[in-house]
């Protein structure tokens, strides 16, 4: 629970259509947020939202925005909606699940101006099976979601081979040199571990720890690079 004048923390979980945002949020609600004062703001712009019964059982309040994409046509209304949520519920956390065809950069532009909110994390979920084709066919939205994110969480990595995974990482790194990239299958991770990574921790993630070690020399390479300081490296995910 919040203390005194502590601000409401806000977590944005973006991702293209069908990437797995809803599945991830369900996992976080079940394992991390259950029993806490949380508001989920979701935009059902052509997508199936989280089941209301599931949220009720978890004690989560849902504030749905169904009149259009929150990061495009409803920027003004969305800001007002967030202010109303803070005023009415005074939650510990607000989780925003935007439309899959929205730009994360636009959402951040709205959120940073809302009084009483502290931006806690802004992450993008990417389907490991579809990363390459979405990068080719939906560049404006897909690339913005990746380039803006502080953490990129790959879904369905257990369903792709190592070659495909490395291609995905290369695409992400081309667009975003600094984001943390989670490649571990979600079933092998706790919700708390994912939250920690979204907030900046690398503990317990071999892929993040390896990349951090690789880059500490200042060479600028990442775990998709073959050579670091003249040495060939193999990385496991």
Question: Where are the regions a protein language model picked out?
Answer:
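Flexible active-site lid/hinge loop adjacent to a nucleotide/diphosphate
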Residues: 132, 136-148
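Nucleotide-state-sensitive switch-loop elements of NTP-binding domains
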Residues: 5-14, 19-135
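Short, hinge-like loop/turn segments at secondary-structure boundaries
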Residues: 56-59, 112-114, 140-142, 198-202
């Amino acid at each position: 629970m919040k203390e005194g004048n502590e601000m409401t923390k806000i977590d944005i979980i973006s991702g293209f259509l069908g990437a797995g945002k809803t599945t991830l949020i369900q996992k976080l609600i079940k394992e991390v947020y259950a029993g806490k004062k949380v508001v989920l703001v979701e935009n059902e712009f052509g997508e199936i939202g989280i089941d209301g019964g599931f949220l009720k059982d978890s004690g989560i309040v849902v504030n749905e925005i169904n009149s259009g994409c929150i990061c495009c046509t409803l920027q003004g209304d969305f800001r007002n909606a967030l202010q109303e949520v803070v005023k009415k519920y005074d939650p510990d956390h607000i989780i925003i699940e935007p439309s899959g065809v929205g730009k994360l950069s636009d959402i951040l532009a709205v959120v940073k101006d809302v009084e009483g909110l502290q931006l806690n994390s802004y992450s993008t979920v990417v389907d490991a099976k579809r990363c390459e084709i979405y990068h080719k066919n939906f560049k404006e939205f897909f690339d913005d979601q990746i380039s803006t994110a502080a953490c990129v969480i790959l879904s369905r990595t257990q369903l792709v081979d190592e070659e495909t995974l490395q291609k995905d990482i290369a695409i992400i790194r081309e667009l975003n040199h600094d984001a943390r990239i989670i490649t571990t299958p979600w079933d092998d991770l706790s919700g708390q571990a994912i939250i920690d990574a979204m907030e900046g921790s690398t503990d317990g993630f071999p892929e993040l720890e390896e990349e951090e070690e690789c880059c500490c020399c200042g060479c600028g390479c990442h775990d998709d690079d073959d050579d670091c300081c003249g040495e060939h490296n193999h990385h496991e995910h």
